[in-house]
Amino acid sequence: GVTFDDGAYTGIREINFEYNSETAIGGLRVTYDLNGMPFVAEDHKSFITGFKPVKISLEFPSEYIVEVSGYVGKVEGYTVIRSLTFKTNKQTYGPYGVTNGTPFSLPIENGLIVGFKGSIGYWLDYFSIYLSL
């Protein structure tokens, strides 16, 4: 896949991504907060089509992500992110995608998620997060 690195900002306002209920997570585009102003990061798109769009608009700054979870598994021989769930201090969004494979969970006990990086090919291969403490 193609690696991406959005860098770190001052918060997250909106998360847009795509999923397929039979395969995995596709593209990802995040609207961050940059010192009180929205900043739309680059659209990291899948190489293929056939996904359903998801738009998660957070009530920034009072709503923030406290956990990212999901499933990792094989699709056509590739290990990819098959499912994503975003839990905020107010509600849970998801799960989106295929909830089977190896589960993962990134609970955030201290700090805020302020950025994403990862790799996307046909599907979201992997991602990691930037934290602000």
Curated annotation (Swiss-Prot):
Outcome (variant: V72I): In minor forms
SMART domains hit by this protein: Jacalin
Domain of life: Eukaryota
A Pfam family of this chain: Jacalin
Keyword Chloroplast on entry: no
SUPFAM superfamilies reported for this sequence: Mannose-binding lectins
UniProt entry keywords in alphabetical sequence: Lectin
InterPro entries for this protein: Jacalin-like_lectin_dom, Jacalin-like_lectin_dom_plant, Jacalin-like_lectin_dom_sf
A molecular-function term among this protein's GO annotations: carbohydrate binding
Domain Jacalin-type lectin: 1-133
Record-annotated disulphide pairs: none
Transcription regulation among keywords: no
Function of the protein: D-galactose-specific lectin, binds the T-antigen structure Gal-beta1,3-GalNAc.
PANTHER family xrefs: JACALIN-RELATED LECTIN 19 (PTHR47293:SF15), JACALIN-RELATED LECTIN 3 (PTHR47293)
Quaternary assembly: Formed of four alpha chains and four beta chains.
Family: Belongs to the jacalin lectin family.
Protein name, as recorded: Agglutinin alpha chain
Provenance organism: Maclura pomifera
